[in-house]
Amino acid sequence: MLIDDSSDDNFFHEREIKKADLTNLVITKNSGKEALEYLKSKTDPRSDLIFLDINMPGMNGWEFLEEYNQLDKELQSEAIIIMLTTSDYPDDLAAAKMWSSVSDYITKPLTKEMMKDIADKYFK
């Protein structure tokens, strides 16, 4: 699942994920709230991997994590959550490390090489 308020980023990242053959189905949501509503109402297909933008209006990535961690465990589906950012702001990296549900923190844009590294790290 891609959670990002930028439709352009979602379009580009979905293309990179498909090029890397990580999955056949990429679910995109334009806000944290929209993603939570989807996760609460849909048990299948569950997301194995969530790319979560940090800076979004309304509900940012950190606020999404607070709500996500309160979901029933079966709705969380043990997804690998990777935080996405456009900056190398050290405080964001430090904050990401404080969340046990966050597996990784990377700077946009996603590339085919990054997708290969993610596949090797989490799915092999």
State each model region's role.
Residues M1-D8, H13-I17:
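Conserved acidic segment of CheY-like receiver
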Residues M56:
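Receiver (REC) domain active-site loop signature in two-component systems and cognate sites
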